[in-house]
Swiss-Prot record:
Organism: Streptomyces avermitilis (strain ATCC 31267 / DSM 46492 / JCM 5070 / NBRC 14893 / NCIMB 12804 / NRRL 8165 / MA-4680)
Family: Belongs to the metallo-dependent hydrolases superfamily. Urease alpha subunit family.
UniProt name for this protein: Urease subunit alpha 2
Residues annotated for Ni(2+) 2 binding in this entry: 224, 253, 279
Binding residue positions for substrate: 226
EC number: 3.5.1.5
Disulfide bond annotation, renumbered to this chain: none
Main localisation: cytoplasm
A GO term from the CC aspect: cytoplasm
Cofactor dependency: Ni cation
Modified residues annotated as N6-carboxylysine in this record: 224
Sequence positions that bind Ni(2+) 1: 141, 143, 224, 367
Gene3D superfamilies xref list: Metal-dependent hydrolases, Urease, subunit C, domain 1
PTM section of the record: Carboxylation allows a single lysine to coordinate two nickel ions.
Amino acid sequence: MPEISRPAYADLFGPTTGDRIRLADTDLLIEIEEDRSGGPGLAGDEAVFGGGKVIRESMGQARATRADGTPDTVITGVVIVDHWGIVKADVGMRDGRITGIGKAGNPDTMDGVHPDLVIGPETEIIAGNGRILTAGAIDAHVHLICPQIADEALGSGITTLVGGGTGPAEGSKATTVTPGPWHLARMLEAMEEYPLNFGLLGKGNTVSHDAMLSQIRGGALGLKLHEDWGSTPAVIDAALTVADRTGVQIAIHTDTLNEAGFVGDTLAAIGGRGIHAYHTEGAGGGHAPDIMSVVSEPHVLPSSTNPTRPFTVNTAEEHLDMLMVCHHLNPAVPEDLAFAESRIRPSTIGAEDILHDLGAISIISSDAQAMGRVGEVIMRTWQTAHVMKRRRGALPGDGRADNHRVRRYVAKYTINPALAQGLAREIGSVETGKLADLVLWEPAFFGVKPHLVIKGGQIAYAQMGDANASIPTPQPILPRPMFGAIGRAPASNSFNFVAPLAIEDGLPERLSLGKRFVAIESTRGVTKADMRENDARPRVRIDPDSFAVHIDGELVEATPAAELPMAQRYFLF
């Protein structure tokens, strides 16, 4: 039996089972658990494209037609990194969805070809060999302040935005809300040209069930409660009552000043019902100083935002000015300044790092332009994982590689926000049947600059060189919109997520948009136990005077990082 060395195999076909890959310039390593496209025991029939290579007529390419079921596109030999595992496979896409994960090729000449991965003359090929594939990121906390965030999001690997706003109005700059059916309709119209899935949050700060139902019929996939509009116990109870009736999620930013009640009062108003707790973090807002204690609750889905990810020597200083701007505060007013300073606590920011690494905070989002950066969700997630590995060592089950930690952190911006918002039937993971929202990475640039962003099976963004060059690679190489991002393509490759009530009420017919409306699944049964790799519920106690944090009785030492990976090595500015 002829043999091939691992280095030679990796050069030809990419890494295989047992090989390890470093993620960008971090200390994080992944190890391939399984090779479904070749590797040990299966080598010799790998589907690769190029001059003198396999995918040619009557070799790796069959004569089967699209009518016979061949995929529209196959990504060859790519390393999938997802919450369910780290495997190498060929990935097929058809009609904008993932149709197969396994071995692609021509069953007439090759053994073990997956029936849904037969390569025909109508199949396009993307070379994934030596690259990493993840699900498109879901940013579940976005202020829709300016349309340019769409490009920043796509260029970073985000394919779905959930949030609210109407533009640079004070309400939108502070509170992630698109209020009322008129604004909801206008924002849905505005989003037609972007190859992103959108979900809008209506205003839940009211005791009027009629007002909330009007917004859900008008296109809101959920409701947002924000302290700047008054997150009182009565409002919380009313919003959750409507949510239980309609299946939508409630996202809450609780009462920093504890004016209408403390964290215990908020939990009492929630009453064991499911809720997505925005800003379960060290400085983003909510009950001061102990909002993070909600991570121990079984019905609370905790998330935090990226400006505090990870805790560094610059974090606290940066936050004061950001907070004053975002919440329309005046530094000349002592009460406004005291409000801002009460939210910025280094000890709780440091504890946020630990809670993420324990899997106690389940989701990371941006809080885009309202103290967070939409294009840095993915990057800051992996920076946090790197800092935690250096500080805390390997997680249980990790040894030669960090697969457990990597699965935990990738889930925070893919499957878990999808589950929290009722989107997991359609998006959030690399699984057969789901929308082909995928991100292809060069390992050296993982989490920093995507090689390709695939939206609904179509390349929407890519690292691309000079368009007047003779080949695609001459400088300047920049993230640029591709054909999936222009013309009528976004309407075909992307969704507007809305509540079932909006579909039943005829919203798609009333607006007559090109982008498809898709009903969310009910969120009302989703609990902390459903958060993949992030279902821990430690006891958290925060001293009201010193802000010292104890997790399961152990004092947390807030140690800011002075140096990070995925930073100046990759960016000029």
